[in-house]
From Swiss-Prot:
HAMAP family: Glucokinase (MF_00524). GO terms for cellular component: cytosol. GO terms for biological process: glycolytic process. This is Glucokinase. SUPFAM superfamilies: Actin-like ATPase domain. It is found in: Cytoplasm. Pfam families: Glucokinase (PF02685). Keywords: ATP-binding, Cytoplasm, Glycolysis, Kinase, Nucleotide-binding, Transferase. Its main location: cytoplasm. Its EC number is 2.7.1.2. The keyword Cytoplasm applies. It comes from Pseudomonas paraeruginosa (strain DSM 24068 / PA7).
Amino acid sequence: MNNDKNGSSGGLALIGDIGGTNARFALWRGQRLESIAVLACADYPRPELAVRDYLARVGESLANIDSVCLACAGPVGAGDFRFTNNHWSINRAAFREELGLDHLLLVNDFSTMAWAASRLGADELVQVRPGSAQADRARLIIGPGTGLGVGSLLPLGEGRWEVLPCEGGHVDLPVTSARDFAVWESLRERYGHVSAERVLSGNGLLALYEISCALDGIPVRATSAAEVGALALAGDAQADAVLEHFFLWLARVAGNAALTVGALGGVYITGGIVPRFRERFLASGFAGAFASRGKTSGAYLQDVPVWIMTAEHPGLLGAGVALQQALDAESRTGVRATA
């Protein structure tokens, strides 16, 4: 290992956050992001070429970089990775060899949100629900967007963390009212199994709106989640009621997840939906519904704080933190933590 270059000693690394359409890249120096740029995946046959072009654009030499961490949408195992929403794939050995890397780390894209939560400052968070976070307990990260991402962050002491990715978006959707049940029945007719993600996602918000209109005998006026949100913000009563129902369902799912992982360190909300409708979310019944349950479980959650993550590039930040910890672990233990 060349300690003059690797991220564990304040050197230079490359960080990427790769989605279906765009790849965001940054340099990671001294545990900070620099030179952030967004490239279209369709413009490059292979991710290695996108990395080379990014470095050329920011005037940095590949020779100065020996570590790369890429956040990838989908389950990340030990083998090769194929992106589900674009034409790219990564053969770890070939990627390292072509770019001359000592270290390559691939992480799940939602896991980076959990890594980011370990590093965010007060100016990158908006409090939804007051409380007293316990520093030595787990934190929950939940984010409705294209799907419903769920993960947790465990403190290990001495500034070290463990991220536990999961598939919590696929738990059963909780039903607590007659209205919930009516919506759930319609969702079951559409999909069979009704997971939390069937409501708590972009497609889920649209489905909730369509079903609610059908139940109330009101014409459908939106064809996308963005249009539902726009109608709600413009004062449409039906769309606003649907958005409120969405936020209440998020409160129940988040509360259940917090109980499951013991998230007394707090709950962090991310994803593409809640930050977009932040003011409406803050005015919703989320804060009360989060801990509104039986006597014992309600008391357990009563002092758990909830925040919205507002950092501009949490995926890149989280990937940088993940790489930093992996390199530090290698240096400390001598056991390789990267490919």
